[in-house]
Amino acid sequence: LGDAVRAYGVKLALENQGYKSELIAYSDDLDGLRKVPEGMKEFGLEEHIGKPVSLIPDPYGCHDSYGMHMSSILLDGLDKVGIKYEFRRAIDTYKQGLLKDHIHTILQNSVKIGDKISELVGQEKYQKYLPYFPVCAECNRLYTAEATEYIVTEKKVKYTCHDTEIGSKTIKGCGHEGEADITKDLGKLAWKVEFAARWSAFDIRFEAYGKDIM
């Protein structure tokens, strides 16, 4: 809520100067579930670890997914404090193809991007894998499906679903090897590059961020 309040202050300041401005409340509901939240152990969410939260059923049964249920808590807070916003969901953004051209450009330049990420923050992962995670066609997990090759002419990535370390936890992969079409199949950019893609696609002029995103 704090980030939204600060961004809303910038929006109001711009409007006070005569500019048109809008606040986008963006739900990263294509991100995978990394752990079961405290107080929710009894809902059987453990089996969904690694799956996009928008593909996990709402354990309370009142929204179309676990992700939308959690998003609704933030939106309720924004409504209560009177913040005006436009709500957007990651799953809709990707399904509608709003980032497909950005994904194509990023994957074509993945070597340069991997080297730059390593240089700036010391993370070498994207020198080995593409900065794009397809949703595994077999187990529906995200972070376990690591893409190693981009077929430019077909706009497809080749990936293997294998065990992946997320923090101190190991998420089990199913071993599936496949291809995913970035224009049709579900998947998402790694957040370090997705940040830039969203700024371009939505014409974002201000958003709080840390130095690891630069």
Regions found by a protein language model. Give the residues of each.
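N-terminal Rossmann-like or analogous alpha/beta NTP/dinucleotide-binding catalytic cores
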Residues: L1-G114
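Alpha-helical recognition segments enriched in aromatics with Gly/Pro capping
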Residues: N109, E119-M214
